[in-house]
Design a protein with these regions (language model features):
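A detector for small-residue-rich transmembrane helices and their helix-helix packing motifs
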Residues: 1-234
Length: 234
């Protein structure tokens, strides 16, 4: 497998995140901080996606990006070589697919944080970091392509269909955002996920002439209900 866009993102993000964890000055220069954005430092919308709070935060995001961005070999004679979104984009859009995928990832960093910025633009105590918004965009783009693929949780042998996971993810994230009792930017997860859906739909529709929403619904309509929840290895 050639070095993919996803792998390049993972390598760069991991190197910068690890460097920033031991360097407070570097962390302060890259973190999303609305008052600094107000002073013209718009790069923070993007640079904050290159840093993470700790190894668990970094590991979870990069593993999720790997599984949904690259996926596993499909062994198909026709179709994408791997099941991940980057390769699905190349299947739909041809050689420009990897660049459209990269564009989605970068734009998702911005779009996911816009609501947080508007809400906290004068809040001198607010900071945010991590690639979760962009990773959520990739995950939800993947669910559009394969709504029945089982999504599980670490060490729990239960897998639910992607489209059910998407609904639960949005509902729970919205509930936790309203509670506001943790230090997680659930808003970035929600808007990153919604952007991933919208970007993939419009790109497929207007660049490739492919109605992915009809494709998505057809897969669900033709599915066996037993595919929605599976126990054991997926």
């Amino acid at each position: 497998m050639e070095l993919s866009i996803t792998l390049i993102i993972i390598i760069i993000t991991s190197l910068i995140s690890l460097s920033a964890m031991g360097n407070h000055k570097m962390m302060d220069e890259l973190i999303f901080y609305p008052p600094s954005v107000n002073r013209g430092q718009w790069y923070r919308f993007f640079s904050c996606g290159l840093i993470h709070a700790d190894l668990a935060h970094l590991g979870f995001n990069m593993l999720s990006l790997y599984f949904f961005g690259i996926g596993t070999p499909t062994h198909l004679s026709e179709g994408p070589a791997y099941s991940g979104v980057e390769y699905m984009f190349m299947w739909v859009f041809g050689n420009q697919g990897k660049w459209i995928y990269l564009g989605m990832y970068i734009l998702a960093l911005l779009v996911a944080l816009l609501p947080s910025y508007l809400k906290n633009r004068h809040n001198y105590h607010y900071r945010s970091l991590g690639a979760s918004g962009a990773v959520s965009a990739v995950i939800f783009a993947g669910i559009l392509f394969d709504p029945l693929s089982g999504i599980g949780f670490f060490f729990i042998p239960v897998f639910i269909a992607g489209f059910i996971y998407a609904i639960l993810f949005l509902v729970i994230s919205q509930w936790m955002e309203r509670r506001g009792r943790d230090n997680i930017n659930h808003s970035a997860h929600i808007f990153g996920a919604l952007f991933g859906l919208a970007f993939t739909f419009f790109a497929c529709r207007y660049i490739a002439g492919f109605n992915i929403f009809n494709y998505f619904l057809e897969l669900i309509r033709n599915a066996n209900p037993s595919d929605f929840i599976q126990f054991g290895s997926n």
